[in-house]
From Swiss-Prot:
Major place of residence: membrane
Compartments where found: Cell membrane
Organism: Pseudomonas fluorescens (strain SBW25)
UniProt-listed NCBIfam families: PRK13682.1-1, PRK13682.1-4
This protein's UniProt keywords: Cell membrane, Membrane, Transmembrane, Transmembrane helix
Signal sequence residues: none
Domain of life, source organism: Bacteria
Coiled-coil region: none
Any Pfam family matching the protein: DUF1328
Stated name of the protein: UPF0391 membrane protein PFLU_0090
Transmembrane segments: 4-24, 29-49
Disulfide bond annotation, renumbered to this chain: none
Topology in the lipid bilayer: Multi-pass membrane protein
Length: 54
């Protein structure tokens, strides 16, 4: 699950770079939302994944 969160976080960062660069101006808002959502998912996966192994 952690690998999925990292994958989607990278996708959100790429979308943000493209959106902020002016290539897709309307994608800026979507990229911001995706970045926050997947950052939260990454942090949650990191902590819950570590707790399950102990």
């Amino acid at each position: 699950m952690l690998s999925w969160a990292i994958t989607f976080l990278i996708i959100a960062i790429v979308a943000a770079v493209l959106g902020f660069g002016g290539i897709a101006g309307t994608a800026t808002g979507i990229a911001k939302i995706l970045f926050v959502v997947f950052l939260v998912m990454f942090i949650a996966s990191f902590f819950f994944g570590r707790r399950g192994r102990g």
